[in-house]
């Protein structure tokens, strides 16, 4: 198969796109960027789409992506940005309702995923992802009412999961999960009766396994 020839005009166009993005959002993104921090920039769906139009190899070295505190509701442009080495993703404090795009992104080396303060109602899309190295999962302050998908998630190294302040009624899935490294969970701020559940067998069994279960507050992130 013939390799694609990159014309001078293509390079100029790519540079123009990147310059346009950097100027608009006051960033300094270049080919040496390891931490892609575009937090608190009023970045919206249109801006994220613009960023996805820059050269694919621009993101080869990125290990941390921070898009927190913006106005994003659609993360599908991330699919074509060719991230291969991401260890940390923070998309907290946006307007995200759908995370199906994560199914098509290489998250094999990912260690931290922060989706807190969004509008998620379920986490079903996460079942299809191989989170072989995920350590911390923050789902706090969403609208999640069903967490049964946790039973089918592949997270052999998951140590912390924050479900603080959602709409969860049933935590029976924690009788069936297989997270051998899990050491802390927060269920606080959900729709069940916390006084009743604090002595529930599920909570007791998790604690017997060495897991710190918090039913009254959020938890400190491990990473």
Outline where the language-model segments fall:
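Conserved "Asn-ladder"/turn position within leucine-rich repeats
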Residues: 41, 70, 94, 118, ...
């Amino acid at each position: 198969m013939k390799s694609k020839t990159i014309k001078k005009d293509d390079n100029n166009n790519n540079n123009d796109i990147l310059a346009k993005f950097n100027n608009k959002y006051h960033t300094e993104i270049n080919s040496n960027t390891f931490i892609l921090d575009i937090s608190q920039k009023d970045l919206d769906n249109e801006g994220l789409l613009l960023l996805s139009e820059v050269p694919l190899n621009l993101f080869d070295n990125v290990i941390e992506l921070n898009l927190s505190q913006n106005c994003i509701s659609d993360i599908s442009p991330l699919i074509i940005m060719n991230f291969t080495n991401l260890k940390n993703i923070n998309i907290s404090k946006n307007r995200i309702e759908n995370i199906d795009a994560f199914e098509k992104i290489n998250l094999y080396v990912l260690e931290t995923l922060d989706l807190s303060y969004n509008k998620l109602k379920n986490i079903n899309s996460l079942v299809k992802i191989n989170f072989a190295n995920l350590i911390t999962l923050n789902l706090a302050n969403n609208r999640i009412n069903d967490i049964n998908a946790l039973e089918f998630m592949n997270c052999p190294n998951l140590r912390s999961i924050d479900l603080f302040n959602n709409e969860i009624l049933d935590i029976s899935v924690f009788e069936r999960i297989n997270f051998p490294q899990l050491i802390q969970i927060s269920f606080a701020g959900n729709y069940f009766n916390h006084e009743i559940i604090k002595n529930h067998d599920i909570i007791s069994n998790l604690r017997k396994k060495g897991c710190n279960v918090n039913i009254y507050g959020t938890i400190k992130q491990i990473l």
